[in-house]
Design a protein with these regions (language model features):
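The feature marks the mature, well-folded catalytic cores of soluble enzymes
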Residues: 1-204
Length: 204
């Protein structure tokens, strides 16, 4: 029985961390954050509330990251700044410079939750959670591209290999350019232990 996480992307959620968008997205500039012309912070807040309600109704406990007017608009996407294993969390380093400070929020939250931190990706390495996919409990695929580089993959491998976890790097297609930011999870969505929804034309 794991104490801190699950090395699976198909099992039911039991505990998650989330952040409210109300304050952090209120003043977000569309062009700066690449949100597109249809971005509406009020609507984003409403939709996030519905999403959080669905997560809670699924039976998962939600721990809320400290709220604040810190301008970290993307911090509501809590999957990216850290990776949780059965033994604890790994603090990642964001490839999008506007998101670098989000990792400290995750570190603070894990400390409050008594979740141990196994390591941290340091410069010049970058790894974002959206580029990490658990193939099985002992295999982590990591997409190398705009937001995750080889130095980050090497550091992540050094942290996880002592736990018996193989880290497999793969090249991601650029597709529509760097600003579009294609993550590995944009291509692969695990549905069950032996089933995934994939976009074959872009599959590494």
């Amino acid at each position: 029985m794991s104490a801190f996480g699950s090395q699976s992307m198909a099992l039911p959620l039991k505990r998650v961390i989330m952040r409210l968008p109300d304050r952090v997205m209120a003043g977000a500039e569309r062009d700066v954050w690449h949100y597109g012309p249809q971005f509406d912070p009020r609507k984003a807040s409403e939709q996030h509330s519905v999403f959080a309600d669905l997560v809670a109704k699924s039976g998962a406990d939600i721990t809320w990251i400290r709220d604040g007017n810190d301008g970290l608009s993307d911090s509501i996407f809590t999957h990216d700044p850290s990776l949780v294993t059965d033994k604890g969390a790994v603090l990642l380093r964001m490839g999008k410079s506007l998101r670098l400070d989000e990792t400290d929020l995750h570190e603070e939250t894990y400390r409050e939750m008594n979740v141990p931190v196994l390591g941290r990706i340091e410069a010049p390495g970058t790894v974002e959670g959206g580029d990490c996919v658990w193939v099985d409990s002992k295999t982590l695929a990591v997409g190398r591209g705009v937001r995750t580089n080889q130095s980050g993959i090497d550091q992540l491998r050094a942290i996880l290999e002592p736990l018996g976890i193989a880290v497999l790097g793969c090249d991601l297609p650029l597709w529509q350019g760097e600003e579009a930011c294609l993550h590995l999870m944009s291509i692969i969505s695990p549905l069950a232990e032996d089933l995934a929804l994939v976009h074959l034309p872009l599959l590494p």
